[in-house]
């Protein structure tokens, strides 16, 4: 089908997804193939221009993603950069990730989607996305289309050469952005090594490198962040990956900011969510938001497993 016809169809898919209605299996397959063509051209350190709005974990909380767009502006009117973790834990991982990928295919210059530690075959089999795909489609094909696509997602982004965005954090194997550019990202997230660290590491109050309680990645201190930012001409590392009660949290003397965009995480944590708006001079402001009003969602009684992922 020609580009014009496909764009028309894509607009219909986006409209449908905005109503939280899933696409059928064939449509998902087509969408993922188109997305691969776009993502394969993107760098491990994808260059992004400001103004842009930077978002953290969404975790299948579709109605809260709608609230995020309400607060931050619709795509493509607002440029967005999402730092991973679209799936697992929330009840609408399928609709959430399908919508974000559809927006990426429709407006490739207006939205950037990075890989999080949950964009992985192994993690999604444990934390909900795999089971949700089985439940909603009756087989694992859609799960396979998406997890194959996840291998293509860029690992990091660089806003105007100054603000470095990624899901997790820094790595003892990586001193420069060129080290990241040289990685082969087209694979499942490894258990260890630089690619793993970028998606799993966390900032810490202690200096230097530490063993991560998550069992993957490292903890890194302010000395590490300052050295990395200085060596690479950066003003800030922006990352997600950790629940923060106000939706955003500065650390390491403002060398690092954590942004978390899933309010009342797992429908039980009681946290606010936030997004970071960067204007055309790279001035930042944070917009906080609470959960969208919900109708007819399963009442959460099961205690969510203690999480370190």
Curated annotation (Swiss-Prot):
Sorted alphabetically, which CDD domains does this protein's record hold? MPP_PP2A_PP4_PP6
What is the superkingdom listed in this entry's lineage?
Answer: Eukaryota
| One Pfam match | Metallophos
Active site annotation, chain numbering = 118
Q: Where does Mn(2+) 2 bind?
A: 85, 117, 167, 241
- Catalyzed reactions: O-phospho-L-seryl-[protein] + H2O = L-seryl-[protein] + phosphate; O-phospho-L-threonyl-[protein] + H2O = L-threonyl-[protein] + phosphate
How is the cofactor bound, in the record's words? Binds 2 manganese ions per subunit.
A GO term for molecular function = protein serine/threonine phosphatase activity
The UniProt PTM text for this protein says: Reversibly methyl esterified on Leu-309 by leucine carboxyl methyltransferase 1 (Lcmt1) and protein phosphatase methylesterase 1 (PPME1). Carboxyl methylation influences the affinity of the catalytic subunit for the different regulatory subunits, thereby modulating the PP2A holoenzyme's substrate specificity, enzyme activity and cellular localization. Phosphorylation of either threonine (by autophosphorylation-activated protein kinase) or tyrosine results in inactivation of the phosphatase. Auto-dephosphorylation has been suggested as a mechanism for reactivation.
Extract the SMART domains matched here: PP2Ac
Binding of Mn(2+) 1 occurs at 57, 59, 85
Residue ranges of the TM segments:
none
Nucleotide-binding as a keyword of this entry, yes or no, is: no
Note the Gene3D superfamilies from the entry. Answer: 3.60.21.10
Cofactors needed by this protein, per the record, are:
Mn(2+)
Instruction: Indicate where the modification Leucine methyl ester is found in the sequence.
Output: 309
Q: Where in the cell? A: Cytoplasm; Nucleus; Chromosome, Centromere; Cytoplasm, Cytoskeleton, Spindle pole
Record-listed Phosphotyrosine modification sites: 307
User: Family per UniProt?
Assistant: Belongs to the PPP phosphatase family. PP-1 subfamily.
What is annotated about its quaternary structure and interactions?
Found in a complex with at least ARL2, PPP2CB, PPP2R1A, PPP2R2A, PPP2R5E and TBCD. Interacts with TBCD. PP2A consists of a common heterodimeric core enzyme (composed of a 36 kDa catalytic subunit (subunit C) and a 65 kDa constant regulatory subunit (PR65) (subunit A)) that associates with a variety of regulatory subunits. Proteins that associate with the core dimer include three families of regulatory subunits B (the R2/B/PR55/B55, R3/B''/PR72/PR130/PR59 and R5/B'/B56 families), the 48 kDa variable regulatory subunit, viral proteins, and cell signaling molecules. Binds PPME1.
What is the protein name for this chain? Answer: Serine/threonine-protein phosphatase 2A catalytic subunit beta isoform
């Amino acid at each position: 089908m020609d580009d014009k016809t496909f764009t028309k169809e894509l607009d219909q898919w986006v409209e449908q997804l905005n109503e939280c209605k899933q696409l059928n299996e064939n449509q998902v397959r087509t969408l993922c193939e188109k997305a691969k063509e776009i993502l394969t051209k993107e760098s491990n350190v994808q260059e992004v221009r400001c103004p842009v709005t930077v978002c953290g974990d969404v975790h299948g909380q579709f109605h809260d993603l709608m609230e995020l767009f309400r607060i931050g502006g619709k795509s493509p009117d607002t440029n967005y950069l999402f730092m991973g973790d679209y799936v697992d834990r929330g009840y609408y991982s399928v609709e959430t990730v399908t919508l974000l990928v559809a927006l990426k295919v429709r407006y490739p210059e207006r939205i950037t989607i990075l890989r999080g530690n949950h964009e992985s075959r192994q993690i999604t089999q444990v934390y909900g996305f795999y089971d949700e795909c089985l439940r909603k489609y009756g087989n694992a094909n859609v799960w396979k289309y998406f997890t194959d696509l996840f291998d293509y997602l860029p690992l990091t982004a660089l806003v105007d050469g100054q603000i470095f965005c990624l899901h997790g954090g820094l790595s003892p194997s990586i001193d420069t952005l060129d080290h990241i550019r040289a990685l082969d990202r087209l694979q499942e997230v490894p258990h260890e090594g630089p690619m793993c660290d970028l998606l799993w590491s966390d900032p810490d109050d202690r200096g230097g490198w530490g063993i991560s309680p998550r069992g993957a990645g490292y903890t890194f201190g302010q000395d590490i962040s300052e050295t990395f930012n200085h060596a690479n001409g950066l003003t800030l590392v922006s990352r997600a990956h950790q629940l923060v009660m106000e939706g955003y949290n500065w650390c390491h003397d403002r060398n690092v900011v954590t942004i978390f965009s899933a309010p009342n995480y797992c429908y039980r944590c009681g946290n606010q969510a936030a997004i970071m708006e960067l204007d055309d001079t790279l001035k930042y402001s944070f917009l906080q938001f609470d959960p969208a009003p919900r109708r007819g969602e399963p009442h959460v009684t099961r205690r969510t497993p203690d999480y370190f992922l």
